[in-house]
A protein has these predicted regions:
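Metalloprotease/metallohydrolase-associated module, dominated by Zn2+-dependent proteases
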Residues: 2-34, 38-48, 61, 83-135
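Conserved residues at the C-terminal ends of beta-strands
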Residues: 31, 54, 79
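Short, aliphatic-rich beta-strand segments
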Residues: 49-55
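Amphipathic alpha-helical interaction segments
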Residues: 58-59, 76, 80, 84
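Short alpha-helix carrying the canonical HExxH Zn2+-binding catalytic motif
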Residues: 62-78
Length: 135
C-alpha cells in the first residue's frame, strides 16, 4: 500500500539545496511503497518528480537516509534536465548496451551514467551529513 505524495520538509530542502543548484527541490514528492511494475527490489525509485521508497527506507534523521534521498533526487533532476522519455530511453539503452557487451545485470546497472552521477551525489551528501552529525 502506498502513501499519499508528500513534499520534502523545509529543513531537508535547505540541507540538500547546495547539492542541487538551480533545481527546485520543492517540486519533489515522496511516497512510501515501490510501484508494482518496478523490478529489482530497489530501496528507492524516482519517476519524474516523485520518489518512491520501500517501507521504512525514508529516514531523514540519518546520513544514510539523506544520502539515499539525494541519490533519488539526482534522478528527478535528470528527468527534468533531459525530459521524461529521453531520460528513460537513455537509461534503458545504457543498461541493455552493458548487458549486450557481457556485463551482468548488476554491472550493467552500476555502469549506467545516470546511476554513476547519482552515486557520486549520494556519496558527497553522506560525507557532508556525517561530518555535520559529528560536530
Amino acid at each position: 500500500m502506498r502513501s499519499e505524495p508528500e513534499a520534502l520538509p523545509d529543513e531537508v530542502v535547505q540541507l540538500l539545496a547546495p547539492f542541487f543548484p538551480g533545481y527546485d527541490l520543492a517540486r519533489v514528492r515522496t511516497i512510501e511503497g515501490i510501484p508494482f511494475y518496478v523490478f529489482g527490489n530497489p530501496v528507492g525509485y524516482a519517476d519524474r518528480d516523485r520518489i518512491y521508497f520501500e517501507a521504512g527506507a525514508y529516514r531523514l534523521d540519518t546520513p544514510e537516509g539523506l544520502a539515499l534521498l539525494a541519490h533519488e533526487v539526482t534522478h528527478c533532476r535528470q528527468y527534468h534536465r533531459h525530459g521524461t522519455w529521453r531520460f528513460r530511453a537513455r537509461y534503458l539503452w545504457s543498461y541493455f548496451h552493458g548487458r549486450l557487451n557481457g556485463m551482468s545485470g548488476k554491472e550493467a546497472y552500476l555502469n549506467i551514467p545516470y546511476e554513476i552521477e547519482a552515486r557520486e551525489v549520494e556519496a558527497r551528501v553522506y560525507l557532508t551529513m556525517k561530518r555535520l552529525q559529528e560536530n
